[in-house]
Amino acid sequence: MRIEISSDNPLEHATPALVVGCFEDERGRVFEECDAALGGCLGRLAETREFTGKAGTTRLLHTLGKLPAERLLLVGLGKKADLTHERLRQAAGHAMQALRTSRAASFASTLPLASSLPRATESVAIGSLLGSYSFDLYKTKDKEQRFAFEEMTLMAPQPEREMARAVAEQAEQICRGVQLARDLVSHPGNVVTPGYLAQAARELAARHALEVRVYEQDELESLGMNALLGVGKGAAEPPRLIVLRYRGEGAKGRPVVLVGKGITFDSGGISIKPGPGMEEMKTDMAGAAAVFGTLEAAALLRLPVDLIGVVPTTENMPDGKAFKPGDVLASLSGTTIEITNTDAEGRLILCDALHFAQKFKPAAMIDLATLTGACVVALGHEASAVLGNDQRLVDALKKSGDETGERLWQLPLWDEYGEGMKSDIADIKNAGSRDGGTIKAAWFLKQFVGETRWAHLDIAGTAWSEKARPYSPKGATGVGVRLLIEYLRRK
């Protein structure tokens, strides 16, 4: 979808649809002027409470030639004092849903004019772009009749036009990263394999002149990455370790390292999962997808940062060669791990990757993983969990999460949680009792980060949505990309 910026009077702008934001407690200039042009019908809707301006509501009207805009789409913003960037993004997303239903491929939006928030244009652009997303690559019927958005015109005052254009371009670049992450998670597991991710990394590197290295199985064996190799023993395709590096112009200091869990399909292995819902286990590489998407967006934005992405990737499958409960694996760090549950495999591939990443001497290391079902039990689908060994890093990520709507909730990481991870025959075991499962998984990872400033994001409940949300359709959300870009921009 193309983005244009216009300083036209909204009432004089010809468009298939004009989006107008409406507050519950204030009508606003554009609303009043449109109401006058339409003979008071908008005011009548408000008086009869057929449209109240409540957040999340929309109302589409045909102007019947009384305005250059063919249709008027009213979008509720709630009470003016409660307006936030997230509410603007959601309003833009609700508008996209209504426009899709009415098949308005091109439209103009006055939503940026409804707010004095400093980044209103960016919020509206992001909500609109992400709300326009659909994934229908594998559908073969009625291709010629499928709807696709073509052009969005954002209205901005003349003095702010060029700034709005630059902000909209940045929003588009961020959304390209989110869309890459969504696409990778949406593909089926027979397409996205470890080899596919390796090729996607090479293509990403080629697009933006990034450094890339893919460690193949023989190299992993030479390095001693036996935790990663152990998980991949039951898979037909060998595991890989993918390393990408973006060196932004003007970057100073040590790099930031992102580590993303890349289990391209998780059957649970010998500790096999129940059949119902197993098809969603193609999403167990959402952490890897977020790392790829963040690198894409950072490169497009030309952020002045040194950013490294590390992605351990494999499938977790049952097989005669698969690792088993009771096995002991010697990790890259030398720590020995008793396997008590082969379905606790994500932490195994991550522990080798985290130890490996220390060689870059990072200023901060952040891992993202669909790691535990316990996180979904604790937080549902409205927030990701964050845990770490550095409170300043955790606080910075939480602030970025609040700003972008990708909210984080901090869980404790006290040493007592490690008591249940002690093994009788090895240094530690990979899974303890079910209680506090998210914390225990993070405690396990903490054993492999050394003194590096580190934070862990458990995105198990937020990487995939079983329902459509205002600016995210049912399916992959691309969570983590916008949060991390905001964190990097603030550095």
From Swiss-Prot:
Matches recorded under InterPro entries: Leucine_aapep/pepB, Macro_dom-like, Peptidase_M17_C, Peptidase_M17_leu_NH2_pept, Peptidase_M17_N
GO cellular component, one term: cytoplasm
Keywords tagged on the record: Aminopeptidase, Cytoplasm, Hydrolase, Manganese, Metal-binding, Protease
CDD domains listed in its UniProt record: Peptidase_M17
Entry note: cofactor: Binds 2 manganese ions per subunit.
Annotated active site: K273, R347
Needed cofactors: Mn(2+)
Descriptive protein name: Probable cytosol aminopeptidase
Native organism taxonomy: Bacteria, Pseudomonadati, Thermodesulfobacteriota, Desulfuromonadia, Geobacterales
Gene name per UniProt: pepA
